[in-house]
Regions:
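Non-heme Fe(II)/2-oxoglutarate
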Residues: 1-115
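A short glycine-rich, His/Asp/Glu-containing loop-to-beta-strand
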Residues: 110-133
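A short beta-loop-beta micro-motif enriched in histidine and acidic residues
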Residues: 115-117, 132-151, 167
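Short, conserved beta-strand element in jelly-roll/cupin
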Residues: 122-125, 142-160, 205
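Short proline/glycine-enriched turn/loop segments at secondary-structure junctions
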Residues: 141, 189-195
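A short hydrophobic beta-strand segment most commonly corresponding to one strand
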Residues: 149-155, 179-181, 196-213
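A short beta-strand-loop-beta hairpin characteristic of the jelly-roll/cupin
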Residues: 151-175
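Conserved metal-binding segment of the jelly-roll/cupin
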Residues: 172-188
Length: 219
C-alpha cells in the first residue's frame, strides 16, 4: 500500500527497488526474466472463447487481488497520477481480462499449487498499453513477500508489434507454452500491443508452496 509521503506509485516502488534505473545500461534477457521452461499447449480449442469473452480493464478495474476487487483508494490515486502526469488518460484501457478459466488452464493452475492463487487471462488487444510500473504484490504475504510468486504462461505465439519490456530489455519471440517469472518486487516492466493480433497470457499469482517448487523442477 502506498505510504502518505508518496503521491506517485512509481516513485514509491522505485524508492525501494534494487533495479539500477540506468537507461544507458544494456540488460540481457537472463538479467530480467527467469525462463522456467515450456509446456505443450493444450488450450488451442479454448482460445477463441478466451478472447471473445475477455473484458476491457483499467488500473481501477483490473482486479486488485481477484475479480471485482478494487484497489485501495490511495493506491489507485497514485497509479492514476503516474498516467495523468505524463499527459495520458488515467482511465485508458490497459488490457482485456478474462476471469473464466477453462479446464485446460485450471489443470495448469492446479499443477502450480500456489496458495491463495489469483488466476486471470490477459488479452492485450492492439492499441492497448499497460504503462511502466513495478508490481506491489506484498499483500499476498506481508510477513514474507519472498514467498510470493507471479508466473506467466504464454497462450499464443509472439506476433510482430507485441512488446513486453522488463528493465531495459525488450522481450519478444516467445512461443505458446513458454513459462516465465521475474523479480516482481524490483523489476520495472510494461507491455503494449502495436500489432495486428491479441496477445494472450495466463497469469498466476500466489504464495509458493512445496508443490510449486516440485512442479517447476519438472519443467
Amino acid at each position: 500500500m502506498i505510504t502518505d509521503e508518496f503521491k506517485s506509485s512509481w516513485d514509491f516502488t522505485k524508492s525501494y527497488s534494487t533495479y539500477h534505473f540506468d537507461s544507458v545500461k544494456i540488460d540481457r534477457l537472463e538479467d530480467v526474466i527467469d525462463h522456467l521452461g515450456h509446456i505443450e499447449p493444450t488450450w488451442q480449442a479454448d482460445l477463441e472463447d478466451i478472447v471473445a469473452n475477455s473484458n476491457p480493464a483499467t488500473w481501477e478495474t483490473r482486479g486488485y487481488k481477484g475479480e471485482g476487487i478494487p484497489p485501495p483508494r490511495e493506491d489507485l490515486l497514485a497509479e492514476e497520477y503516474d498516467i495523468e502526469r505524463v499527459g495520458a488518460d488515467p482511465k485508458m484501457i490497459i488490457t482485456h481480462i478474462n476471469w473464466r478459466i477453462p479446464d485446460s488452464l485450471q489443470a495448469i493452475a492446479a499443477a502450480f499449487g500456489l496458495d491463495d492463487c489469483m488466476e486471470r487471462i490477459h488479452v492485450q488487444q492492439p492499441g492497448e498499453v499497460w504503462n511502466l510500473h513495478i508490481d506491489k504484490l506484498q499483500k499476498w504475504c506481508p510477513e514474507d513477500p519472498s514467498k510470493i510468486g507471479r508466473y506467466f504462461v504464454q497462450l499464443t505465439d509472439w506476433q510482430p508489434g507485441q512488446f513486453w519490456e522488463y528493465g531495459n530489455h525488450h522481450w519478444n519471440q516467445w512461443r505458446a507454452g513458454d513459462i516465465s517469472t521475474f523479480d516482481w518486487a524490483n523489476m520495472p516492466h510494461s507491455t503494449a500491443n502495436a500489432g495486428h493480433h491479441p496477445r494472450v497470457t495466463f497469469q498466476l499469482t500466489g504464495v509458493i508452496t512445496e508443490k510449486t517448487k516440485a512442479f517447476l523442477a519438472t519443467l
